[in-house]
């Protein structure tokens, strides 16, 4: 198994850690940007499937107004 000859300096360890953190931050920013563009549905680079349309419009409005109509 490979074993390092000398102890790695704190400066070198810090540089490597900073590189890893920077790459993680860049990936997180990219993912957030991609998520934001998907939620706005304004970008042209993605395919947005059409929303399913219910044939019976009463299914979507179930429960609304029934209690209010009964009280009157």
Curated annotation (Swiss-Prot):
Ranges of Basic and acidic residues composition bias in the record: 59-72
The family database entries (Pfam families) matched by this protein are listed as: Ribosomal_L32p (PF01783)
Q: Where is this region: Disordered?
A: 49-72
Which InterPro entries did the record assign?
Ribosomal_bL32, Ribosomal_bL32_plant/cyanobact
Which BP terms in the Gene Ontology apply to this protein?
Answer: translation
Q: Name its cellular compartments.
A: Plastid, Chloroplast
Q: Which GO molecular function annotation, any one, does this entry have?
A: structural constituent of ribosome
**Transmembrane stretches, by residue range?**
none
The entry's keywords:
Chloroplast, Plastid, Ribonucleoprotein, Ribosomal protein
Gene Ontology CC: chloroplast; large ribosomal subunit
Please report which protein family the annotation says this sequence is part of. Belongs to the bacterial ribosomal protein bL32 family.
Report the protein name in the record. Answer: Large ribosomal subunit protein bL32c
Protein's organism: Ostreococcus tauri
């Amino acid at each position: 198994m490979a074993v390092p000859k000398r102890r790695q300096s704190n400066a070198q360890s810090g540089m490597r850690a900073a590189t890893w953190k920077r790459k993680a931050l860049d990936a997180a920013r990219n993912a957030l940007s991609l998520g934001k563009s998907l939620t706005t549905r304004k970008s042209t680079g993605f395919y947005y499937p059409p929303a399913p349309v219910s044939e019976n419009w009463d299914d979507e409005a179930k429960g609304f107004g029934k209690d209010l109509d009964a009280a009157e």
